[in-house]
């Protein structure tokens, strides 16, 4: 990270660091998790090290470089990336596609109290080009030299897992029963053959998340005003449920399932 920034400084270039939206989870204990600024968490030890490394180390290195050298250096906090809007292809070996595959392999999916904000990969790519100024953009140029700004590459249009996504999957042709989350984990564990049940490979991961009675996740609310002003592709959010995109995901997975 430091060598990359040093090279960018010598070449009078710019540096954009792709962080993760999960880094903002560290801000839950701060004044505002929605803030589009770099902050210093005082309770970071209570959260996972993976997020800590991004918010407290990598993100702050970028911020320090921008503040002390005058170079353009920005952090892009990127949310959950999904398949593209044209073909719907989404890597079937990722955790979410594997989870959804149990609709086909086991005939079940869990009922989750979760709010989601997925963003198609091609929209993410376009937004990065806009925010970085590679695609000419007066607003991103105007914000370029403000070292405190963090861009949230997020979808401001959210949807609900059980109320929105599961019906959309059924409308896309998948037939499955909806189980309480702990029962879904038990069903997942009941078929140990990874050829019949590829999702079993992530049993520990899903058991840790869902084999409990913890309340659902409402998700973080991100400050999007500055990001959307500099990225036309993100302005107003991207609709996933009512555009046929879920059906394209399922169609792209069908030959692989």
Predicted regions and their residues:
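NAD(P)-dependent short-chain dehydrogenase/reductase
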Residues: 48, 63-136, 168
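Conserved Rossmann-fold NAD(P)-dependent oxidoreductase catalytic core, especially the SDR/UDP-sugar
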Residues: 1-52, 74, 81-87
């Amino acid at each position: 990270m430091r060598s990359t920034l040093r090279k960018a400084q010598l070449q009078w270039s710019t540096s954009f660091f792709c962080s993760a939206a999960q880094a903002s989870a560290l801000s839950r204990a701060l004044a505002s998790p929605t803030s589009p600024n770099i902050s210093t968490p005082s309770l970071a030890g209570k959260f996972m090290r993976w997020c800590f490394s991004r918010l407290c180390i990598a993100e702050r290195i970028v911020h320090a470089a921008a503040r002390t050298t005058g170079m353009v250096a920005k952090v892009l906090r990127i949310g959950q990336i999904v398949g593209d809007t044209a073909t719907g292809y989404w890597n079937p070996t990722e955790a979410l596609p594997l989870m959804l595959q149990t609709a086909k392999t086991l005939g079940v999916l869990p009922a989750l109290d979760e709010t989601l904000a997925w963003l198609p990969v091609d929209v993410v790519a376009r937004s990065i080009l806009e925010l970085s100024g590679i695609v000419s953009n007066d607003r991103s140029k105007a914000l370029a030299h403000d070292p405190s700004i963090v861009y949230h590459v997020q979808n401001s249009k959210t949807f609900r897992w059980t109320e929105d996504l599961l019906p959309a999957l059924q409308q896309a042709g998948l037939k499955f029963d909806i189980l309480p989350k702990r029962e879904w984990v038990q069903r997942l564990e009941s078929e140990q053959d990874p050829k019949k049940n590829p999702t079993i490979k992530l049993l520990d991961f899903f058991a840790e998340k869902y084999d409990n009675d913890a309340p659902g996740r409402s998700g973080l609310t991100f400050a999007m005003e500055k990001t959307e002003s500099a990225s036309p592709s993100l302005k107003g959010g991207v609709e996933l449920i009512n555009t046929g995109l879920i059906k394209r995901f399922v169609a792209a997975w069908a030959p692989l399932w």
